[in-house]
C-alpha cells in the first residue's frame, strides 16, 4: 500500500520507509565521486596556452621526423604546422603585438637548414626512395614559398640564434608542466619530471598484503571515509554547478612560484655548466646547416684579366635562373671588383664589373611593378655614379650596346666594353619614380626620398656628358628628354627677375637650358614620341614662367591637338597637364577667354583628377577591373608634380562667370541662346532653385554668389566674394605675384559688371552720363568710353555717343520687357495651336474628307468598271474640297496674325 494513505499498517509504513531510503541512497550514489576525481584540481587554460601547446607538439613531431629523415611525414606535419599557425594568428596579434614567436622562427630556420642539407647531399638524394624524393621537392618548394613572409625575422634570428624570448620560456614552461619536454627543447633546458599535484587523502596505515582481516578493515574504512566525504560535499556544494567550478587557492599560486623558481635554477645550472666547459673562451654556435660562401679563386691561382672575366661570366651565368641567391650574387660581384682593384687589372675591367653589379641589383626585385629596397637603391646610386666617373675620366674606354661580346677589348687602348649606360640610367629614373609613388606624400619618408632627386639628376648629368662626347643623336635625344622631364615642372624665379631687368642678360636660366635641349630634339629626333614630349614640356615650362605668346605659338604651330588622340597614355597625360598650366598662364596674363578654352575640356568631364593622373576616383563595381586599376596606378604622377585641382576649378569658374554673365544679360529673352560653360550654368541654376541660400563657404559657393551680384551690376559685392581672406588662402596666394592677379581680377569684375548693367537696364534709360558710370564703377572715363564704343561697334548695344555732353543716347530699337514677354507668349500660343491641330488630325484621320469611302462597294467589293469610274470622280471632287479648305485655313491664320500685331501696336501707343 502506498505510504500516502493515512490509515496504513505499521509494517506497510516500515516497508514504505525502507523503499524511500533505498531510492535516496541510489540518487546519492549516482553523483558519488571517487577520491581521485574529487581531489584533482581542474586547470583552465587560456587560448594562448592551447595554441602554443598545439604548435609545440607539431614542432616536436617535425623534429622527430627529421631525425629519421621521414620526409613524407615531415611534409604533412609542416602543412599541419602552417594551419595551426594560421589559427594562432589572432592570439599572436593580440598577445605578441603581431611579432612572430621565436620558437616558431627557430623551427622554420631548422627546417630550412635541414632541407638545404638534404638537397645538397647529392649522393644521399640518389639513394632516397621515390616517395621520399618526390616529397623532398614538394617540401622544398612549399617551405621556400612560405618563409618569404618571414625573411626579416629569419635574418634577425640567424644573427643571434642563441637568444631566448619570453615566448620560448612559456613554451618550455608548458613542456615542463605537461611532462613531455624532449631532449631537443627550444631553450636547451633538460627535461624535468612532472611535479605530482597534492591530493587530499586521509593517512592510511601500512599493513601486510596477505592479511585478509586487515584488508577488510581497510576496505571498510575507505567506504566509511567516502560516505563521510560525500556527505561533506553535499553539505558544501548546495548547487551542482559549484562542484565543477575552478577552485582558486593560495596553494595554486605557491605551485606556480615554485615552478618558476625551478626553471630559474635549471637555467643557472646550465649556464654554469656551459661556462665550465668553455675554459674561458666564447664561441658562437650556429644551429643547422651552414652554407659556406663559395671561394672566389684558388689559393695559389694567378689572378689576371682572363681569370677575372671568366669568374665574372660564371657568376652572371646564373642570372635569371631558379634557386639563384641574388643577394649572394651581388656580394660576389663586389668582392670580384675589390680583387680586380687590388691587382690593378685596369679600368675597363672595373667598368665591366660595375655594369654587371647594376644589372644584378636590377634583377634582385623580380616584380617590375614593385619598388626596390632602400638599401639596394642607395647602392645603385653609388655604383652608377662611380661607373660614370670612371667612363668620363678615361676617354679611351668606349662602352656601347653595339659592341659584341667577342669584340670586347680589355688589354690595349682603346678599350671596348659591351653595355648601355643609357638604359641603366633610364631604369634608375623609373625606379626613383616608383619609390616616390610608394611613399605617403604627407610623411617624412617622401621628403627624404625626394632629396635623392639631386643624386638622380647628377647621375643623368654625368651620362649626358658622356654621350655628348661619344654618342649618337638618338642616344643624346633620349638622355636630353630625361633631363627635360626633371626640369620642365620646376619654377625658376630668376626668369622673371631677368625679364624685369634685375639680372644681367647673360644670366643662364632654366628657360635657356630648356630651349637648348628642346631645339636639339626638334632638329635631330627621328621618333615622334620624343619630339612630342619635348614640345609639351617646353610649352609647360614657358607657361609656368608667363611666356604666354611663346607657349601659344608652340601649340598652334605643332598642331598637337590634332594628333594627340593617337599618342600613348603617358603622353596624353602630359598634354592634359600642359593645357591646364597653359590655362593658368592665360588667366594670369588677363586672357580670360583663352583660359576658359584651355580648361573647358578638362573640367567639363568632371574628372580632372584622373585626366591629370593625380588619383583615381571611386568607380562602380564593373566599370574598372583590378588589372586596369593597377595599370592606372602605375601611370600616376608623383605628388610633388601635382597641379592644385581647386585652383584649376576656381580659375575655370571665374573665367566662365566673366564670360557667361554678360552674355546672359545680353540675351535674356533669346530662347535659342547657347551656354558658354555648361558646368558654371548648372552651378548657377542649382543655386537659384534653392529656397534658402546661406552665406558662401566653399569655393564654388563664393563664385556663384559673385555671379549673382554681377547680374545686378553690383561690382563691389562681386569683388568681395571673389577676393577675400578665405579665397586668398585657398586659391589666389598659390599664384606667383598674387597681388598682381588680385588687381587684375578686380579690374575685370568692374568692366564686366558695367557691361552687364548696360545690357540689363538699357531699356530703362533714354540717355546716361558716362562720368556717372565711371564714378559708379570706379573706372577712368576713357575706359568707360572705350567699353561702350566697343559694345556699339559690335552691335551689342543699340545706342549712340554724344561726345560734347559725354552721354550715351539709347535708341530703344529692341523691344521692352513687356513687349518681349508678349512676343514670347504669342510664339508659345502659336506653337501650342499647331501641335493641337496635328494631334487632332492623327486621332480623327481623313475619314470624313474622302467622300463615300465608307461604302463597301467603294472598297473594291463591287468590281464593275462603272462603279470604279464614279468612284474616281468622287475622289477628284473630294481632293478639290480639301485644297479649298486648306487655303481658307491658311488665310484665317494670316488674318489672326495681323490682328495680333495690331493689338501689340495699340498697346505700345497706349
Curated annotation (Swiss-Prot):
Residues 11-20, 162-186, 209-235 have a biased composition (Acidic residues). Keywords: Cytoplasm, Initiation factor, Phosphoprotein, Protein biosynthesis. GO terms for biological process: formation of cytoplasmic translation initiation complex; translational initiation. This is Eukaryotic translation initiation factor 3 subunit C. GO terms for molecular function: RNA binding; translation initiation factor activity; translation initiation factor binding. The keyword Transmembrane does not apply. The modification Phosphoserine is found at residues 34, 165, 176, 185. It is found in: Cytoplasm. PANTHER family: EUKARYOTIC TRANSLATION INITATION FACTOR 3, SUBUNIT 8 EIF3S8 -RELATED (PTHR13937), EUKARYOTIC TRANSLATION INITIATION FACTOR 3 SUBUNIT C-RELATED (PTHR13937:SF0). Belongs to the eIF-3 subunit C family. One of its GO terms (cellular component) is eukaryotic translation initiation factor 3 complex. Residues 240-268 have a biased composition (Basic and acidic residues). Residues 639-815 form the PCI domain. Component of the eukaryotic translation initiation factor 3 (eIF-3) complex, which is involved in protein synthesis of a specialized repertoire of mRNAs and, together with other initiation factors, stimulates binding of mRNA and methionyl-tRNAi to the 40S ribosome. The eIF-3 complex specifically targets and initiates translation of a subset of mRNAs involved in cell proliferation. Residues 194-207, 862-874, 895-910 have a biased composition (Low complexity). The gene is eIF3c. The keyword Phosphoprotein applies. It comes from the Eukaryota. Its main location: cytoplasm. Residues 882-891 have a biased composition (Basic residues). InterPro entries: EIF3C (IPR027516), EIF3C_N_dom (IPR008905), PCI_dom (IPR000717), WH_DNA-bd_sf (IPR036390). It holds the Pfam family PCI. Component of the eukaryotic translation initiation factor 3 (eIF-3) complex. The eIF-3 complex interacts with pix.
Amino acid at each position: 500500500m502506498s505510504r500516502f494513505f493515512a490509515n496504513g499498517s505499521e509494517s506497510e509504513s516500515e516497508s514504505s520507509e525502507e523503499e524511500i531510503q533505498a531510492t535516496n541512497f541510489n540518487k546519492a550514489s549516482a553523483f558519488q565521486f571517487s577520491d581521485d576525481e574529487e581531489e584533482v584540481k581542474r586547470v583552465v587554460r587560456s587560448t594562448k596556452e592551447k595554441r602554443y601547446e598545439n604548435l609545440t607538439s607539431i614542432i616536436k613531431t617535425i623534429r622527430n621526423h627529421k631525425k629519421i629523415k621521414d620526409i613524407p611525414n615531415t611534409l604533412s606535419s609542416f602543412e599541419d604546422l602552417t594551419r595551426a599557425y594560421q589559427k594562432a594568428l589572432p592570439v599572436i596579434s593580440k598577445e605578441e603585438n603581431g611579432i612572430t614567436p621565436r620558437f616558431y622562427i627557430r623551427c622554420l630556420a631548422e627546417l630550412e637548414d635541414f632541407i638545404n642539407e638534404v638537397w645538397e647531399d647529392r649522393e644521399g638524394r640518389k639513394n632516397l626512395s621515390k616517395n621520399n624524393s618526390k616529397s623532398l621537392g614538394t617540401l622544398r618548394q612549399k617551405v621556400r614559398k612560405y618563409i618569404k613572409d618571414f625573411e626579416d625575422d629569419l635574418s634577425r634570428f640567424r644573427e643571434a640564434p642563441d637568444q631566448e624570448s619570453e615566448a620560448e620560456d612559456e613554451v618550455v614552461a608548458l613542456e615542463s608542466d605537461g611532462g613531455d619536454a624532449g631532449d631537443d627543447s627550444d631553450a636547451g633546458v633538460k627535461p624535468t619530471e612532472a611535479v605530482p599535484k597534492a591530493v587530499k587523502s586521509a593517512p592510511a596505515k601500512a599493513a601486510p598484503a596477505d592479511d585478509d582481516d586487515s584488508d577488510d578493515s581497510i576496505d571498510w574504512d575507505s567506504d566509511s571515509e567516502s560516505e563521510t566525504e560525500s556527505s561533506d560535499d553535499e553539505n558544501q556544494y548546495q548547487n551542482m554547478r559549484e562542484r565543477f567550478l575552478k577552485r582558486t587557492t593560495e596553494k595554486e599560486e605557491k605551485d606556480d612560484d615554485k615552478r618558476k623558481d625551478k626553471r630559474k635554477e635549471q637555467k643557472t645550472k646550465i649556464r654554469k655548466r656551459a661556462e665550465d666547459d668553455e675554459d674561458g673562451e666564447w664561441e658562437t654556435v650556429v644551429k643547422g646547416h651552414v652554407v659556406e660562401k663559395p671561394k672566389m679563386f684558388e689559393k695559389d691561382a694567378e689572378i689576371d684579366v682572363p681569370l677575372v672575366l671568366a669568374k665574372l661570366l660564371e657568376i652572371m651565368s646564373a642570372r635569371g635562373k631558379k634557386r639563384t641567391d641574388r643577394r649572394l650574387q651581388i656580394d660576389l660581384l663586389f668582392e670580384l671588383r675589390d680583387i680586380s682593384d687590388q691587382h690593378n687589372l685596369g679600368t675597363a675591367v672595373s667598368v665591366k664589373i660595375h655594369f654587371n653589379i647594376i644589372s644584378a641589383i636590377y634583377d634582385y626585385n623580380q616584380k617590375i611593378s614593385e619598388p626596390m629596397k632602400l638599401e639596394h637603391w642607395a647602392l645603385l646610386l653609388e655604383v652608377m655614379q662611380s661607373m660614370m666617373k670612371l667612363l668620363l675620366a678615361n676617354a679611351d674606354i668606349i662602352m656601347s650596346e653595339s659592341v659584341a661580346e667577342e669584340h670586347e677589348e680589355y688589354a690595349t687602348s682603346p678599350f671596348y666594353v659591351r653595355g648601355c649606360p643609357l638604359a641603366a640610367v633610364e631604369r634608375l629614373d623609373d625606379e626613383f619614380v616608383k619609390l616616390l609613388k610608394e611613399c605617403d606624400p604627407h610623411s617624412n619618408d617622401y621628403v627624404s626620398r625626394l632629396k635623392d632627386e639631386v643624386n638622380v639628376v647628377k647621375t643623368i648629368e654625368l651620362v649626358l656628358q658622356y654621350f655628348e662626347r661619344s654618342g649618337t643623336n638618338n642616344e643624346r635625344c633620349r638622355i636630353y628628354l630625361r633631363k627635360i622631364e626633371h626640369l620642365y615642372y620646376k619654377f625658376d624665379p630668376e626668369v622673371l627677375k631677368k625679364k624685369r631687368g634685375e639680372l644681367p642678360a647673360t644670366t643662364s636660366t632654366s628657360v635657356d637650358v630648356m630651349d637648348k635641349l628642346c631645339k636639339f630634339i626638334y632638329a635631330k629626333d627621328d621618333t615622334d614620341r620624343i619630339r612630342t614630349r619635348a614640345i609639351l614640356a617646353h610649352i609647360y615650362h614657358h607657361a609656368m614662367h608667363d611666356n604666354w605668346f611663346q607657349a601659344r605659338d608652340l601649340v598652334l604651330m605643332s598642331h598637337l591637338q590634332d594628333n594627340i588622340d593617337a599618342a600613348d597614355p603617358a603622353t596624353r597625360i602630359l598634354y592634359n597637364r600642359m593645357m591646364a598650366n597653359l590655362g593658368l598662364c592665360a588667366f594670369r596674363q588677363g586672357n580670360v577667354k583663352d583660359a576658359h578654352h584651355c580648361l573647358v575640356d578638362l573640367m567639363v568631364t568632371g574628372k580632372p583628377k584622373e585626366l591629370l593622373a593625380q588619383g583615381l576616383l571611386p568607380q562602380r563595381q564593373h566599370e574598372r577591373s583590378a588589372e586596369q586599376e593597377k595599370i592606372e596606378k602605375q601611370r600616376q604622377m608623383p605628388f610633388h608634380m601635382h597641379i592644385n585641382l581647386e585652383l584649376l576649378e576656381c580659375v575655370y569658374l571665374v573665367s566662365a562667370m566673366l564670360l557667361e554673365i554678360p552674355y546672359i544679360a545680353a540675351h535674356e529673352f533669346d530662347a535659342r541662346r547657347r551656354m558658354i560653360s555648361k558646368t558654371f550654368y548648372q552651378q548657377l541654376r542649382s543655386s537659384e532653385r534653392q529656397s534658402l541660400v546661406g552665406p558662401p563657404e566653399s569655393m564654388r559657393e563664393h563664385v556663384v554668389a559673385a555671379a549673382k551680384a554681377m547680374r545686378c551690376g553690383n561690382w563691389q559685392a562681386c569683388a568681395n566674394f571673389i577676393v577675400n581672406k578665405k579665397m586668398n588662402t585657398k586659391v589666389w596666394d598659390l599664384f606667383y605675384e598674387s597681388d598682381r592677379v588680385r588687381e587684375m581680377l578686380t579690374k575685370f569684375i568692374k568692366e564686366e559688371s558695367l557691361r552687364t548693367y548696360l545690357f540689363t537696364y538699357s531699356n530703362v534709360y533714354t540717355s546716361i552720363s558716362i562720368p556717372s558710370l565711371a564714378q559708379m564703377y570706379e573706372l577712368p572715363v576713357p575706359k568707360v568710353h572705350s567699353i561702350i564704343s566697343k559694345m556699339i561697334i559690335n552691335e551689342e548695344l543699340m545706342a549712340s555717343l554724344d561726345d560734347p555732353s559725354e552721354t550715351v543716347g539709347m535708341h530703344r530699337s529692341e523691344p521692352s520687357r513687356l513687349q518681349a514677354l508678349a512676343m514670347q507668349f504669342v510664339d508659345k500660343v502659336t506653337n501650342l495651336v499647331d501641335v493641337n491641330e496635328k494631334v487632332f488630325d492623327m486621332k480623327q484621320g481623313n475619314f470624313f474628307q474622302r467622300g463615300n469611302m465608307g461604302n463597301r462597294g467603294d472598297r473594291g467589293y463591287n468590281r464593275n468598271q462603272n462603279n470604279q469610274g464614279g468612284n474616281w470622280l468622287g475622289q477628284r471632287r473630294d481632293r478639290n474640297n480639301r485644297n479649298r479648305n486648306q487655303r481658307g485655313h491658311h488665310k484665317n491664320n494670316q488674318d489672326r496674325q495681323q490682328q495680333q500685331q495690331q493689338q501689340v501696336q495699340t498697346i505700345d501707343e497706349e
